[in-house]
Amino acid sequence: MILVFDVGNTNTVIGVYDREKLLNHWRIRTNPQRTCDEYGILLRSLLENDKLNLKDIKSVVISSVVPTLMMELEWMSRKFFACRPLVIGPGVKSGLAIKYENPREVGADRVVNAVAAYDKYGGPLIIVDFGTATTFCVVSAKGEYLGGAIAPGIIISTEALVSKAAKLPRVELQRPRSLIGKNTVSSMQAGIMYGFVGQVEGIITRMKTEIETTPQVIATGGLAAVIARETDVIDKVDEFLTLDGLRLIYEMNRG
């Protein structure tokens, strides 16, 4: 079995695969202070709760945008699973031609998403990942990673608004009854929800114009389903896109 880690700035998603089958997944808070032993104990608990044996994990794959966690996760892999993890980064085969000016600048999560989306849906593609940042990645029909856009994520944008405007409360991200809010909470919900829907629609429309083709638009990330319900520019929400990409890259680099 393969254990995969998608370490984001806010959350870490962990999945366990038996060949191509995702047996289970877990979402935990990303904590840069967590030690390798704490990760190991946590994983033992999660696996045993699902009747999975720690000894059945033969490989570990890690994608992380938090550099300070890498050493602890590598140590955890060696100590608890007796294996050297595959860390997504420069030198790891992805099957994509990276057309960035400096390919090393492309985040591991963006590469992983592109690999999975191209494998599952073909190209051309626009991949939108709703994470701490909202990222837009373009993949050509030939499997070239052409680049993309990075915008502030929904949660951090909302937190910035609340922290800088003393009278504004924290609100739940949900569809308001009306775009024209009748109180502070509904007005904030309207602005946040439809502000981000408009951002997604605007960027995707402009990208389609620039690449002069009609790509499929695949969305992933914690809030993908929420935004996708409010717009018709997203063709499909794929909750496990990143985890699937980690498994695919492992297969490319195995042996």
From Swiss-Prot:
Pathway(s) annotated for this protein in UniProt: Cofactor biosynthesis; coenzyme A biosynthesis; CoA from (R)-pantothenate: step 1/5
Chain sites annotated for binding substrate: 100, 107-110, 184
Protein's cellular compartments: Cytoplasm
Any one GO biological process: coenzyme A biosynthetic process
Catalytic reactions of this protein: (R)-pantothenate + ATP = (R)-4'-phosphopantothenate + ADP + H(+)
Keywords: ATP-binding, Coenzyme A biosynthesis, Cytoplasm, Kinase, Metal-binding, Nucleotide-binding, Potassium, Transferase
Binding site for K(+): 129
PANTHER family with a match to the protein in the record: TYPE III PANTOTHENATE KINASE
Protein's UniProt name: Type III pantothenate kinase
Source organism phylogeny: Bacteria, Bacillati, Bacillota, Clostridia, Eubacteriales
